[in-house]
């Protein structure tokens, strides 16, 4: 759902490339005229679930960092669920992903899960003190307890 209008600059003269912009979906900055192709390109990016999970792990944190920097309100479980449900609704029904059958509905579900992962990561980034700091403190408390009880000798 809603991938048919995804205009991406694909072809340009290499010597006209000035650089790139964006962190999630990078776009070239180049000198030259732009034209739109009349035919769609076949975009076979979703090879298997494992590759999709690796790709999601890479880009969801980038999106979460950018979103966390721009957000003013705290992420709640309700917000996470609402974002996932609405993403599925948009992809599957509003943008008619259901017309692609099971693959379209699965893709809508994957996009909804990714949206929730982004907001879960924003939630993690909003935690003060950080989860890593809290866990380090708990681990130290356990080590201290074990030392006192004579279970470890560090």
Regions found by a protein language model. Give the residues of each.
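Catalytic-site signature of metal-activated, phosphate-bearing donor transferases
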Residues: 1-129, 136, 151
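Alpha-helical transmembrane segments and their immediate juxtamembrane flanks
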Residues: 130-154
């Amino acid at each position: 759902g809603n991938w048919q209008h995804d205009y991406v600059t694909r072809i340009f003269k290499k010597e006209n490339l000035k650089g790139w912009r964006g962190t999630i979906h990078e776009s070239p900055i180049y000198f030259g005229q732009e034209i739109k192709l009349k035919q769609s390109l076949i975009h076979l990016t979703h090879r298997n679930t494992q590759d999709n999970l690796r790709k999601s792990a890479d880009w969801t944190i980038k999106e979460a960092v950018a979103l966390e920097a721009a957000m003013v309100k705290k992420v709640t479980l309700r917000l996470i669920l609402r974002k996932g449900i609405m993403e599925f609704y948009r992809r599957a029904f509003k943008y008619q992903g259901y017309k692609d059958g099971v693959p379209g509905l699965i893709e809508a579900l994957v996009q909804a899960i990714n949206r929730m992962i982004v907001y879960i990561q924003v939630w993690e980034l909003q935690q003060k003190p950080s989860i890593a700091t809290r866990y380090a403190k708990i681990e130290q408390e356990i080590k201290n307890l074990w030392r006192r009880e004579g279970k470890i000798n560090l």
